């Protein structure tokens, strides 16, 4: 499905909810850190997503540089906040997608792609013309506009989205986004409307649908309860419209200690979050083990594959 998307860098960028207006065509970088040339930091088979994404052969994951959020605890901070990455062409990116397919990937997994959407869509058009047939995953922090979700229509099969916060003060403190929930809620609703209910293949690998993640943070389980309440409301309105994934893997990376979250979540805290999810009927999904909070689950951003 081609939309004849221009890859000319925007002169007043509005690709994300910040609508910062950066003249990326003139070399300015936006709030996200992205400029006028596509940039990625890693492309490889990834085995640490939810089982229906990683499967047995891995998810063909491409980590893009920059991010529209500024999470003080980001485990990917070298690429999201510090600009690590390699400038590449859309033709090269198309080749990366095809190479991951040849390696046996179950899907193509685009990590924080929003600030590069026009470039990625152009690369997907090229790759599809050359035989790309895998489901495409948009791995997003949830801070999107409804317009952005709609712009991905026909390209994204699976939305792997976070719902990080409900509290505007907490999202302002930890991610520099006081409007996080106000933007994420309608965007996620648009994702669910677009993708439909989850569909799996014969191997149990997701082919279309939404996985909605929440990472429990130390000292903030009340906000986790509020997030889960919102998830439950969606599930009650349309049972099975997404797959919930509650995560315990929080590790205090980057500037976490400066914002009062310089420790891992306790077993007691996480058990309370899981129990709340279960009480709300959010049982048809994933509940991560506490042992997942280990630094070795973070990939090395050494420009592998790009």
Specify the residue positions occupied by each region the protein language model found:
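N-terminal [4Fe-4S]-dependent radical SAM core
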Residues: 1-68, 72, 76-81, 301-303
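Conserved alpha-helical substructure of the radical SAM core
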Residues: 78-107, 276
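Positions that flank functional sites
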Residues: 89, 115-116, 292-293
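Flexible, glycine- and charge-enriched loops at secondary-structure boundaries
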Residues: 86-90, 177, 181, 263-267
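Auxiliary Fe-S-binding modules of radical SAM enzymes
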Residues: 1-29, 197-306
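Short Fe-S-cluster ligation motifs
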Residues: 40-61, 95-113, 285-287
